[in-house]
Amino acid sequence: MGKPIVAIVGRPNVGKSTLFNKLAGKRISIVQDTPGVTRDRVYAEAEWLNYNFTMIDTGGIEPTNDDIIMKQMRRQANIAIETADVIVFIVDGKEGLTAADQEVANMLRKSKKPVVLVVNKIDSLKYEENSWEFYNLGIGDPITISASQALGLGDMLDRVVEHFDRFDADAEEDEYIRIAMIGKPNVGKSSLINKLLGEERLIVSDVAGTTRDAIDSYLETEQGKFILIDTAGLRRKSKVKEEIERYSVIRTYASIEKADVCILMIDAQDGVTEQDEKIIGYAHELNKAIIVLVNKWDLVEKDDKTMEKFKKDLQGSLKFMPYAEYLFISALTGQRTHKILELAKKCYNNYNKRVSTGILNDVISKAILMKEPPIVSLKRMKIYYATQVATKPPKFVFFVNDASASHFSYERYLENQLRNSFDFKGTGIQIEYRQRKE
């Protein structure tokens, strides 16, 4: 199961972006910021009280009249309801309760999702009583904060993480391999999922997933148990194109967060687009298992060298993830679709692989004998030993004399040695240096 997702919801100018940027400013143990496809800051990886989670800023276009504000608030609340596990609902303590606040509160109550009500702009104790009227929303006790002054944020996050304990109960789904199908509209994701579901006799059930538009399909095959996280419902007709694009990004990123294996489907006639690179780049940053699926291969004029040349071109465009697996298919005709789940299982096994410490250090010792670390700033890093500390993704910690003497080229060399020795094809891996005395 992926990390819990926390969405920040509220009408324009209540302080959503201020709060998000305060969190993303590394003032509360933020681990990593990830820009969205639209280059807006959509996601921030966060940690609080040893809980890791993902914050979403559901802000976007700020409407100019009341009718559009209400429509925007409904759409924003829907996005939060669809993608989030916990919702932070921000209201303006200085302006007071509004009709838009009431409408969103009604939607959030019906969602059955945990909601943390936050009254912002309470910059001093004299404004505390301003929060009382928000009890009328009927969604629990309000937490008062000042996002701009970073007051009350700890209490707010304490309330948020209280809802995370229920995620420990998701162990039943751990035996399923979670696959996110990602890619631009019209590339064939829906056709492929229907093909996979139609070919497999042992479908367990289709259940509503984390999004209303998408369906998470549970199925069992000879290869194993799978959950297909369908992002086919990303498209929605709207006059406000940029707004919907942003929400599509949020849905897609939420799918990546929850997945073990990310399958990027591209159109053989279009190749890799800039949007494809950014979306799969996020999966790469999270070190997910990755497959690039080239669809509509039946429409390409080809000879016996076309596929290899096409693959090399793709690898050139996606050179930041040389470990990715590639498969050329036709969702329409079924060409090679029977290989998809088999390849996904292989990538997942590598994503979940654990290496014994003894064998690992034998490999590292030989690697150092073949090529010792370079001198960096008059210092040479000495590696004492290494150990694997996690799976999904595989994470290796190297204990060294001086982590500041590390060099990216040598880290790449060590990664290649690990990949060559233990077959991590199809998955990202992590390497971390920890300093210790000899």
Curated annotation (Swiss-Prot):
<dbReference type="GO" id="GO:0043022">
    <property type="term" value="F:ribosome binding"/>
</dbReference>
<dbReference type="GO" id="GO:0005525">
    <property type="term" value="F:GTP binding"/>
</dbReference>
<feature type="domain" description="EngA-type G 2">
    <location>
        <begin position="177"/>
        <end position="352"/>
    </location>
</feature>
<keyword id="KW-0547">Nucleotide-binding</keyword>
<feature type="binding site">
    <location>
        <begin position="295"/>
        <end position="298"/>
    </location>
    <ligand>
        <name>GTP 2</name>
    </ligand>
</feature>
<feature type="domain" description="KH-like">
    <location>
        <begin position="353"/>
        <end position="437"/>
    </location>
</feature>
<feature type="binding site">
    <location>
        <begin position="230"/>
        <end position="234"/>
    </location>
    <ligand>
        <name>GTP 2</name>
    </ligand>
</feature>
<dbReference type="Pfam" id="PF01926">
    <property type="entry name" value="MMR_HSR1"/>
</dbReference>
<dbReference type="InterPro" id="IPR005225">
    <property type="entry name" value="Small_GTP-bd"/>
</dbReference>
<dbReference type="InterPro" id="IPR027417">
    <property type="entry name" value="P-loop_NTPase"/>
</dbReference>
<feature type="binding site">
    <location>
        <begin position="120"/>
        <end position="123"/>
    </location>
    <ligand>
        <name>GTP 1</name>
    </ligand>
</feature>
<dbReference type="InterPro" id="IPR032859">
    <property type="entry name" value="KH_dom-like"/>
</dbReference>
<feature type="binding site">
    <location>
        <begin position="57"/>
        <end position="61"/>
    </location>
    <ligand>
        <name>GTP 1</name>
    </ligand>
</feature>
<feature type="domain" description="EngA-type G 1">
    <location>
        <begin position="4"/>
        <end position="168"/>
    </location>
</feature>
<dbReference type="Pfam" id="PF14714">
    <property type="entry name" value="KH_dom-like"/>
</dbReference>
<dbReference type="InterPro" id="IPR016484">
    <property type="entry name" value="GTPase_Der"/>
</dbReference>
<dbReference type="InterPro" id="IPR006073">
    <property type="entry name" value="GTP-bd"/>
</dbReference>
<protein>
    <recommendedName>
        <fullName>GTPase Der</fullName>
    </recommendedName>
</protein>
<feature type="binding site">
    <location>
        <begin position="183"/>
        <end position="190"/>
    </location>
    <ligand>
        <name>GTP 2</name>
    </ligand>
</feature>
<comment type="subunit">
    <text>Associates with the 50S ribosomal subunit.</text>
</comment>
<dbReference type="InterPro" id="IPR015946">
    <property type="entry name" value="KH_dom-like_a/b"/>
</dbReference>
<comment type="similarity">
    <text>Belongs to the TRAFAC class TrmE-Era-EngA-EngB-Septin-like GTPase superfamily. EngA (Der) GTPase family.</text>
</comment>
<comment type="function">
    <text>GTPase that plays an essential role in the late steps of ribosome biogenesis.</text>
</comment>
<keyword id="KW-0342">GTP-binding</keyword>
<keyword id="KW-0677">Repeat</keyword>
<dbReference type="GO" id="GO:0042254">
    <property type="term" value="P:ribosome biogenesis"/>
</dbReference>
<dbReference type="InterPro" id="IPR031166">
    <property type="entry name" value="G_ENGA"/>
</dbReference>
<feature type="binding site">
    <location>
        <begin position="10"/>
        <end position="17"/>
    </location>
    <ligand>
        <name>GTP 1</name>
    </ligand>
</feature>
<keyword id="KW-0690">Ribosome biogenesis</keyword>
